[in-house]
A protein has these predicted regions:
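Short, Lys/Arg-enriched alpha-helical recognition elements, typified by the DNA-recognition helix
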Residues: 1-71, 80-83, 212-217
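Active-site/catalytic core of tyrosine-dependent DNA strand-transfer enzymes
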Residues: 5, 99-100, 143, 151-155, ...
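Short basic/aromatic active-site micro-motif
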Residues: 23, 58, 225-243
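C-terminal catalytic core of tyrosine-transesterase DNA break-rejoin enzymes
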Residues: 72, 115, 119, 123-130, ...
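Short functional hotspots where side chains directly engage DNA or cofactors
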Residues: 82-83, 143-148, 198, 228, ...
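Catalytic-site neighborhood detector that most strongly recognizes the C-terminal catalytic loop/helix
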Residues: 88, 96, 152, 202, ...
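Conserved small/polar residues in nucleotide/adenosyl-binding loops
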Residues: 277-286
Length: 288
């Protein structure tokens, strides 16, 4: 959830009428409790009425920063959200598609007209907003270099295009020759500056939310487990590490701020890879 949605869909409607100097820790705690119980505005039948722990913590982060600003400008003497109890910071479980599931997914994606987008995602690990923001000018077919320099996201309900969220997100990725060939053939069918234009308007990028819905439908038809689009990014990263890519290179490709972030997210993969390498080395010694 973007910070604009946190502010305009949740914080202002619930706490906006209360003057800052009258806002108490209890008011904010009650607000967070309400979000957990019935704060979801969309897809209630699918996910329930309450927001997830992660989303509530994200709303707190945005609101706490705003109140800190009010303190620094001497509008209020202290931040009333400092002592609020927050839901536990449990990370959403990462899911990775198996090679067999990847094959089934791509076969089904060909039938559903989403093959090129999903193949590129599984070959690069781009974020959903980044892949939707790609233009043909970003890709050099001679060198295979793909520039990632913008993202698509929603601001006040409208699609917007902006620079990536961090300096590290602004990066280049080298595509494998087979992927380049697929994109070259695909380009002849697309009459748009956008690599993946909106089906409704060639002059606009594809809506990341529409891509998410499309993926869900394709996964179901392909008989694969239900995963998020972000899990395709995890799938790329996991397979890259398992096939010998070093963490520093992977960190650059997927746009992490530091290798420490990559190590933290994929520690289980690197640990398993190291253990496997040591085991094979030991087996080799035994056969000498």
């Amino acid at each position: 959830m973007s910070y604009e949605r946190r502010i305009y869909q949740h914080i202002i409607p619930n706490l906006g009428p209360t003057p800052l100097n009258k806002l108490t820790t209890g008011d904010i705690q009650q607000f967070y409790t309400g979000l957990k119980q019935n704060g979801r505005l969309l897809r209630q039948e699918q996910y329930g009425e309450g927001l997830s722990d992660q989303t509530v913590r994200g709303i707190h982060t945005t609101f706490h920063a705003a109140l800190d600003k009010a303190v620094s400008e001497k509008i209020i003497p202290k931040n009333p959200s400092d002592f609020c109890r927050l839901p536990s910071a449990k990370a959403r479980e990462m899911q990775v598609l198996s090679p067999e599931e990847i094959q089934r997914l791509l076969i089904q994606a060909k039938e559903d007209g989403c093959f090129e987008l999903l193949l590129l995602e599984l070959s690069t690990g781009l974020r959903r907003g980044e892949i939707c923001a790609l233009q043909w000018d970003d890709l050099n077919f001679n060198t295979g270099e793909l520039q990632v320099k913008r993202q698509v996201h929603r601001v006040k309900g409208e699609l917007a295009v902006s620079e990536p969220k961090t300096k590290a997100s602004n990066r280049s990725v080298i595509l494998p020759p087979p992927v380049l060939m697929v994109l070259s053939n695909y380009k002849t069918e697309i009459n748009s500056a956008w690599m993946f234009p909106s089906p409704l308007n060639n002059d606009s990028p594809r809506d990341p939310a529409a891509v998410r819905k499309r993926l869900t439908a394709i996964l179901e038809r392909a008989g694969c487990k239900r995963v998020r689009f972000h899990d395709l990014r995890h799938t790329f990263a996991t397979l890259a590490l398992e096939n010998g890519m070093d963490v520093k290179t992977l960190s650059t490709i997927i746009g992490h701020v530091s290798t420490a972030t990559t190590l933290n997210v994929y520690a289980h993969v690197t640990d398993e890879t190291v253990s496997y390498t040591h085991l094979r080395a030991h087996e080799t010694e035994l056969h000498l």
